[in-house]
């Protein structure tokens, strides 16, 4: 998903302290929580470990290795204007980021653009659905009127999930669809 960062300076509902336990369909315990600056290592590992297809679906091109600048941008966020929730999984004593969902808020328009990424080995676990339900709830609590995302037209998993959650699907540009949910 492509994201354009809006320039906002209002609406201060704090999402920076979100934390919730969640269990995947196959019984894995995952902690959903607000991303923090000290998550750079696990965010980089998530991005660097993506399959070509997952990288393309999230970034609209393949990223073989996340740069320090990119990871900093993703982890050092302003919760007045953004929401970023990661899925932390403890695998054999090692903390791993297995997904992230983001919402960039345009308070003036009362809307937000989202992006979602689920690690390949956590796809089809229910995490994408949980992420989107959480983001929708947070958007409503922020008083947003809608959320939307740009999706590659061949990203059938996300398009199917969006339809199941009530998003409308429209055409954006060549090879892309825009999915929108009125809140």
Residue ranges and their predicted role:
Residues 1-183:
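Long, contiguous binding/interaction regions
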């Amino acid at each position: 998903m492509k994201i354009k960062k809006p320039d906002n300076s209002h609406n201060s509902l704090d999402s920076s302290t979100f934390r919730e336990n969640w269990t995947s369909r196959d019984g894995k315990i995952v902690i959903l929580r607000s991303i923090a600056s000290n998550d750079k290592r696990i965010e980089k590992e998530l991005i660097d470990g993506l399959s070509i297809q997952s990288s393309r679906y999230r970034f609209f091109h393949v990223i073989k290795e996340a740069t320090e600048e990119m990871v900093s941008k993703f982890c050092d966020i302003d919760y007045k204007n953004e929401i970023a929730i990661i899925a932390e999984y403890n695998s054999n004593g090692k903390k791993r980021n297995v997904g992230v969902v983001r919402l960039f808020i345009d308070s003036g328009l009362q809307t937000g653009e989202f992006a979602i990424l689920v690690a390949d080995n956590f796809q089809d676990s229910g995490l994408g659905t949980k992420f989107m339900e959480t983001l929708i709830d947070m958007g409503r609590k922020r008083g947003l009127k809608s959320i939307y995302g740009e999706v590659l037209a061949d990203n059938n998993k996300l398009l199917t999930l969006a339809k199941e959650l009530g998003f409308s699907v429209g055409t954006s540009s060549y090879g892309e669809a825009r999915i929108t949910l009125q809140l």
